[in-house]
């Protein structure tokens, strides 16, 4: 393949519309990247090569007749293996779900398919999208972690095995692997993207979001995921320069020098482009956030896995077992207090960060650490 990848998903779709690029060319490029790197990186659980080529040919025929299904027409994507794709297994990185074939698309997948996306296959996740490491390796240094739990999605996008991928986040499972693998990730506003057809961890914390090569691609993916094939993916024009709210405490304090320098450089670049800057402090309620988050996640995980864990506990990874055991031993009053604190912290942050303000903070305190 001797063509350069388009700079954005929208640019690729425009090239397909003009006949300068075909969906089959994009799929072939992704499959070539898999052939080069997958044996070392282990980003994919399964790839439906024949199905992807069939989808590409069908979408190419439509494009030649001037018919585009939507903003993702002909774009190859990966889907994290906790999200249902009709006819593919959803195993969530666990032997307990081995061979569990989805009978229908999750709503978020159905929206992407209706918008013209080509579903290449399922990407690797840590077990039940929790803490036990996956077999995926960091694409830039095999001795360092790719981050989890959306390990495969981030690595696949980084190496051009797909133009975008679905991930999920309960704590940092989109933003962390995206940062470690040098790509972009978006945790959407809670509830803006449906989580039906997704293996849950915590119904109070789970999000489905995109991983892609750029913020522009995240916007295109998110618009379709939230609003469907008819979504307006035009990048909005800003009437006034945006305001940057730099959260100076905790995140920047925890960051190492390299991450801190990159964050400051990014803020400076935005300032030079016309943005306004303000320093903000985290609310008092932040002090308990990590403990309350752990409480919610543990109890919700225990509720989700209650019956299976009782009969097959030994089949769970050690870190998932620890989480579930914590949830089983948590008092009801502590869980209720954690839910109340979640509501309080959300209100406190909304008072600090308005919708027209960009919060600036490192995605992770360090670059990808050595190890799994």
What are these regions (language model features)?
Residues 23-28, 57, 258-281, 306-311, ...:
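Acyltransferase
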Residues 95, 99, 136, 291-293, ...:
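Short, surface-exposed loop/helix-turn segments at secondary-structure junctions
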Residues 72-92, 241-243, 295-350:
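Short helix-loop capping/hinge segments that flank enzyme active sites or metal/cofactor-binding pockets
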Residues 1-54, 272-274:
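An N-terminal boundary/leader segment
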Residues 52-54, 62-135:
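Acidic/His- and Gly-rich active-site-bordering loop/insert found
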Residues 187-267, 284:
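A short helix-breaking turn/cap at a secondary-structure junction
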Residues 19, 30, 74, 80, ...:
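Glycine-rich, small-residue loops and helix-cap segments
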Residues 104-222:
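Short glycine/serine-rich loop segments
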């Amino acid at each position: 393949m001797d063509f350069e990848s388009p700079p954005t998903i929208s640019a690729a779709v425009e090239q397909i519309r003009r006949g300068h690029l075909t969906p089959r060319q994009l799929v072939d490029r992704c499959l070539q990247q898999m052939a080069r790197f997958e044996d070392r990186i282990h980003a994919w659980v399964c790839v439906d090569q024949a199905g992807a080529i069939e989808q590409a040919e069908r979408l190419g025929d439509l494009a030649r007749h001037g018919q585009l299904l939507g903003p993702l027409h002909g774009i190859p994507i990966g889907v994290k293996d906790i999200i249902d794709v009709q006819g593919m297994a959803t195993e969530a990185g666990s032997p307990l779900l081995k061979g569990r074939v989805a009978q229908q698309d999750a709503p978020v997948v159905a929206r992407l398919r209706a918008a013209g996306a080509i579903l290449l296959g399922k990407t690797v996740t840590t077990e039940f999208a929790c803490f036990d490491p996956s077999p995926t390796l960091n694409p830039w240094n095999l001795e360092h972690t790719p981050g989890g739990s959306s390990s495969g999605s981030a690595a696949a996008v980084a190496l051009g095995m797909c133009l975008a991928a679905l991930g999920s986040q309960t704590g940092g499972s989109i933003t962390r692997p995206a940062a470690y693998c040098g790509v972009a990730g978006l945790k959407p506003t809670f509830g803006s993207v449906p989580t039906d057809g997704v293996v849950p961890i915590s119904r109070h914390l789970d999000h489905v979001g995109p991983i892609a090569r750029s913020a522009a691609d995240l916007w295109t993916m998110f618009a379709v995921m939230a609003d469907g094939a008819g979504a307006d993916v035009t990048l909005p024009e800003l009437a006034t320069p945006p305001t940057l709210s730099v959260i100076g405490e905790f995140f920047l304090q925890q960051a190492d020098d390299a991450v801190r320098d990159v964050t400051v450089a990014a803020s400076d670049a935005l300032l030079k482009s016309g943005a306004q800057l303000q320093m903000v402090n985290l609310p008092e309620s932040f002090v308990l956030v990590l403990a309350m988050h752990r409480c919610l996640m543990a109890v919700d995980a225990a509720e989700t896995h209650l019956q299976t864990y009782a009969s097959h506990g030994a089949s769970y990874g050690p870190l998932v077992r620890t989480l579930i055991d914590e949830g089983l031993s948590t008092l009801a009053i502590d869980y209720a207090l954690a839910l109340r604190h979640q509501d309080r912290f959300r209100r406190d942050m909304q008072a600090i960060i308005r919708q027209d303000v960009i919060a600036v903070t490192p995605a992770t305190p360090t670059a990808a650490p050595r190890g799994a």
